[in-house]
């Protein structure tokens, strides 16, 4: 088949292998994993962000993941480093996979295009993904299975990323979840 088709199959198999090794073989007590790719650059608060939002994914049944990416996080649109949103669309690119979600998905993991598959209602079941207005990763790759310089320049080059080392996150004390949309006190 075409190179992108072969690549899509290899990537889906690789993710399944990695999640199986992590959750089912190596770390039976690990509650979640942050999934990253080799062509991402990270904000100074990347790990702090996930430390703050992981408990939200754990306690809120209307969430199924957290991402550090915002497809609409263009540098001319986003200025607030603490703003968080919810979406029904899986953003990917630096995201949190929980053990609970893996246990739900592992027996039906797709043969290709795992990210598009996760966006299907049968998988997310109406649950949402938490993500920052200002991304915590920057997509740096210009060559890959689904990437070339033209695509990168068109869709990724103008995406902002937090560069402020002073941004701090706290684990939330209060959280409104899906009811009123409030996030509680997680930024300082």
Label the model's feature ranges.
Residues 1-31:
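Active-site-proximal specificity loops/subdomain of glycosyltransferases
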Residues 2, 33, 76-82, 87, ...:
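Short acidic-glycine motifs
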Residues 13-16, 44, 116-120:
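A structural signal for well-ordered alpha-helical segments within the folded catalytic domains
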Residues 28-41:
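Short beta-strand-to-loop acidic/aromatic patch adjacent to the donor-nucleotide binding site
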Residues 28-30, 60-63, 127:
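Short, high-confidence coil segments that cap the C-terminus of an alpha-helix
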Residues 43-116:
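Conserved catalytic core of nucleotide-sugar-dependent glycosyltransferases
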Residues 110-188:
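C-terminal catalytic/acceptor-binding lobe
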């Amino acid at each position: 088949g075409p190179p992108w088709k072969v690549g899509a199959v290899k990537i889906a198999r690789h993710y399944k292998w990695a999640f199986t090794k992590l959750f089912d073989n190596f770390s039976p007590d690990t509650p979640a994993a942050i999934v990253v790719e080799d062509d991402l650059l990270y904000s100074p608060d990347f790990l702090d962000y996930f430390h703050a939002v992981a408990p939200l994914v754990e306690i809120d049944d209307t969430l199924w993941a957290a991402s550090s990416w915002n497809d609409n996080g263009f540098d001319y649109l986003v200025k607030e480093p603490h703003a968080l949103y919810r979406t029904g669309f899986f953003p990917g690119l630096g995201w949190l996979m929980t053990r609970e979600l893996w246990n739900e998905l592992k027996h039906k993991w797709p043969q290709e295009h795992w990210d598009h598959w996760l966006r299907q209602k049968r998988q997310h079941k109406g649950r949402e993904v938490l993500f920052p207005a200002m991304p915590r990763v920057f997509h740096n790759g210009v060559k890959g299975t689904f990437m070339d310089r033209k695509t990168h320049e068109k869709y990724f080059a103008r995406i902002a990323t937090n560069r402020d080392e002073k941004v701090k996150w706290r684990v939330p004390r209060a959280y409104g979840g899906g009811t009123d949309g409030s996030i509680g006190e997680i930024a300082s």
